[in-house]
Amino acid sequence: MNEGINNRRKKKISLMEIFIPLFCLINQYEIAGLHLGLICVIAVVAIYFIKYREFYLYKPLFIFFLFMIVHDFFRMFITGFNTGLWVERVLYLLILSCIYKKVDEENLFRVWEIIGIIVMAGIFYQSFQVYILGQSVSTINIFPFLQSNSENYLLGYDRPHSFFLEPAAYCTWILPLLCMCMKRKKHIWMVFISISILLSTSSTGILMTGVIWLFYSFVSARSERKYFNSLMIVGVLIIGIGAFSNLSIFSTALNKLMNISVTNTSNSVRLVLGFQLFWATPLIYKVLGIPYMNVENYMRSGEVALSKYKLSLNLSYLGFVNAIGNCMLIYGVFGLLLYLKLFWNIWKESDLYSKCYVLTCIISIFGQSVFWNSLFVTQFAVMLCSVERTSFIRVTLGQGVTSNSYE
């Protein structure tokens, strides 16, 4: 009986469960030129290793990481080696290796829920300023005494984005909470989160929200035999889209979704530029990757006819491509296959409801730059929490000895 009572007790919230939802927020700021989030990663990893003296490497992620570092090692004879970038990536790998068996999904949901209330309050407050008062809004500064690592936090937007630098970043951050609410059938929470995403007018966020609701209706019909509920969800989505489409504040986002065209520079950069550049490269580049440090250097090299893509050297976003385009160009077709295999492994090893978030992450790599950055860490931290099978390598730190064993 006591054992049953203990099993029903809520586990104590760990440092890692607090850190995951906060990471994207704090990583927007700098201390002495260093990302605050990266400093916190070092601290969290150090505390974790001292306490547990072990970590779990997710095999598909580790294989992809090894491929990238070996690739960059050989490429450094042409382009040099970005030490700072790889220190950051090593730290990201380590923090993701602290997830398995140490992060309780229910605790993570509770923490995200509390932080989500505060962040959504910022969205609703800024929505009042933008849509009722007609004011422009800037990022709500969490640390007034620190500088952001982007100049965007000083800019005024006509779109609410709360504590984030842009609306798309807010939507990417809040989507895990929406999926966790779906898994727990917290419908009121789902509605409020969905409304906050609509208010941000992020086309990516609105698209992902629609995917999540459709996934939920499909699961309800297939697994729970709740066909009426599924029809209601689809009906509400159709009515909601029809109602919101008549509001001027959502016209821009809806037009971006309904009128996607490769001739539009914004759409082209986000969706197809990476693919266009990849197919235009020589065969050797397709196999081994471009012989440049990054995509921007490649586009400034003279090898790319920028006018063909309606681009110029003075653009601030020159070199921006989506995550899958970045992977293809830098690491070639073999890197791309390992990247996609990583998602496939997580998909296979996730439960039914967790697959929904994996699906949104897969879609995001076609429209967002989420390749080994803070959003990448947040996405994979959430996905690895729900991995059920045993694709992990246990690394135990002993007395000068590191022992590896398969779980």
What residues fall within each predicted segment?
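Alpha-helical transmembrane segments of multi-pass inner-membrane proteins
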Residues: E113-V137, N152-Y157, S162-T201, I206-F218
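A membrane-periplasm/extracellular boundary helix in multi-pass inner-membrane enzymes
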Residues: Y125, S220-V262
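Loop-to-helix entry and N-terminal half of a specific, functionally important transmembrane alpha helix
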Residues: K12-L22, L318, N345-W372, A381-M383
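Long extracytoplasmic/lumenal interhelical loops at the membrane interface
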Residues: I260-Y331
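Aromatic-anchored transmembrane helix interface
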Residues: P60-I69, I78-K102
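N-terminal signal-anchor transmembrane segment
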Residues: M1-Y52, F67-R75, I363, V377-V382
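Hydrophobic transmembrane alpha-helices and their immediate junctions
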Residues: K186, W213-F218, R225-M232, I324-I362
